[in-house]
């Protein structure tokens, strides 16, 4: 009987120990996700994307043709201008310098990003020269017979299109050749302006031309191989300072 009691007591003791509460395993706490968060738990947050900058657009028109001015009468595909942006109208552009804009027959296309970040002045010249660093000193050589155009406009972030009225900086010299009473064949093999200053710079802000006296005087060939006929006079145009 005692043996049974001992066995029963031992069994109860084991039962009491085995019926103790199980150890609680802590549940994982889900991460707090705020509204608008797109990153998965454990991932690094993405850098916010910068808003796309407003780009400068160009429209251009030509000043009415004058008898004594240059000879570009309309823009054609392939015409290319240089554009400067200045936010304080100082001697040097505070923003974009000498950006290229190429005309495709309909619109002017920028060769690079040209952001408009504040109210600004736009200064342009044509034809484009990648060596130009200052819009107040655009070089020219009469040997190239380029009609130098210049123009300015104002833009803002709300109105980022520069409406440029391009003006002629150079002078057009027009010569009419006639045979009249000349008894010879009437062949003009060469036409040259001699003893003239041939180079200088143009201020694209004002159109002022500065002659290069250090370069000296030279000759400018403007054509040749003309057969004179009074019924149809030969007209020769030359770009001069």
Which ranges hold each PLM region?
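Sec-type signal peptide cleavage vicinity
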Residues: 18-241
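Sec-dependent bacterial lipoprotein signal peptides
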Residues: 1-17
């Amino acid at each position: 009987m005692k043996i049974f009691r001992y066995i029963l007591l031992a069994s109860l003791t084991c039962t009491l120990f085995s019926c103790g509460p199980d150890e609680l395993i802590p549940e994982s706490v889900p991460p707090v996700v705020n509204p608008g968060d797109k990153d998965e738990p454990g991932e690094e947050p993405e850098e916010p994307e910068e808003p796309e900058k407003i780009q400068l657009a160009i429209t251009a028109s030509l000043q009415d043709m004058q008898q004594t001015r240059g000879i570009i009468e309309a823009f054609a595909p392939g015409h290319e201008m240089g554009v400067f942006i200045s936010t304080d109208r100082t001697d040097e552009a505070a923003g974009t310098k000498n950006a290229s804009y190429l005309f495709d027959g309909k619109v002017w296309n920028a060769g690079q990003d040209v952001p408009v970040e504040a109210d600004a002045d736009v200064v342009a010249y044509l034809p484009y020269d990648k060596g130009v660093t200052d819009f107040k000193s655009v070089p020219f050589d009469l040997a190239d017979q380029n009609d130098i155009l210049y123009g300015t406009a104002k833009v803002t972030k709300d109105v980022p299109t520069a409406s440029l009225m391009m003006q002629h900086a150079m002078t057009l010299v027009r010569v009419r050749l006639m045979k009249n009473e000349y008894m010879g064949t009437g062949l003009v093999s060469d036409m040259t302006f001699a003893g003239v200053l041939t180079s200088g710079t143009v201020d694209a802000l004002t159109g002022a031309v500065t002659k290069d006296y250090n370069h000296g005087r030279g000759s400018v060939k403007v054509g040749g191989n003309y057969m004179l006929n009074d019924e149809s006079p030969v007209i020769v145009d030359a770009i001069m300072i």
